[in-house]
Amino acid sequence: MLFRSWRFYWGVDGTEGEVILKKGDIASFPTNMFRGFQNVSDEEALMFVVLGENDPGVITWTPKLLKDAKESGMVLMNDNSLIDTEKQKITDETKVIQPLKDNELESFDHYSSEDIEKFVIRFNDKDQHFVDDDHYQSNKIINYIDQFQIHDKSFTPNIPHATGFSLSLLNGKSAHIHEYKLEKSEVYHCLSGEWEIDCDGDKVVIKEKDTFSVPKNSLRSIRQISDHDGNLFIIRQTN
């Protein structure tokens, strides 16, 4: 989930492909690939990232990044800490991350820009993906990833990635979802509008860029209360 413009690029040398994404765009990048990103707007930008499963694992760095870091006096350790060798000594060389060898690099997957576009849904194209919620006629929903179900209605995902979480967008000027309860983790992230969340009788309002982590097993409801269309991302644990 993005605010402003971001460039995403991939491959061991960062030249296999790239895509420019803007506010409200969604991309789900496959695992087992090198990727990088940078803010390409003229202003401060925000990127909200959801990592699959409970354990995101460790970061695998490209050999060039490790080489550039070492030349600047910075060393990456296997606990993902960063050591400035001008200020701190490395007490155990075995914990320094070593560059991957050529045969190890061959195990990573490769994607063209056209391949990755299949895993991108742009906000400007949202009308192609919206599904009207028959239960709430004021709601439109896009389900991006994994199965999303609300009040016995299921929404099919647009991106075929098994991530351990579902990602959906609730849209509408009067959009709302009546009370429901979940045993698993759920997070709301506001793209636009103002959303009133009632959680076990306590109310809070979130606005653009705000995030709310819903306590497990709580009874919650949400509704859009601004005078304009609102867009709310719903991220839900599925595994």
Where are these regions (language model features)?
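Glycine- and charge-enriched low-complexity intrinsically disordered segments
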Residues: 63-79
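Conserved catalytic-core segments centered on acid/base and nucleophilic motifs
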Residues: 1, 6-9, 25-29, 35-38, ...
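A short, N-terminal "cap"/entry segment at the start of jelly-roll beta-barrel domains
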Residues: 2, 76-166
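Short acidic-glycine-tyrosine-enriched beta hairpin
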Residues: 12-30, 201-217
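Short, conserved beta-strand element in jelly-roll/cupin
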Residues: 1-12, 162, 168-172, 180-197, ...
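Conserved short histidine dyad/triad with adjacent acidic residue
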Residues: 149-155, 166-183, 216
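A short hydrophobic beta-strand segment most commonly corresponding to one strand
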Residues: 27-28, 36, 42-61, 187-188, ...
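Short histidine-centered beta-strand/loop micro-motifs
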Residues: 10, 18-20, 38-39, 155-161, ...
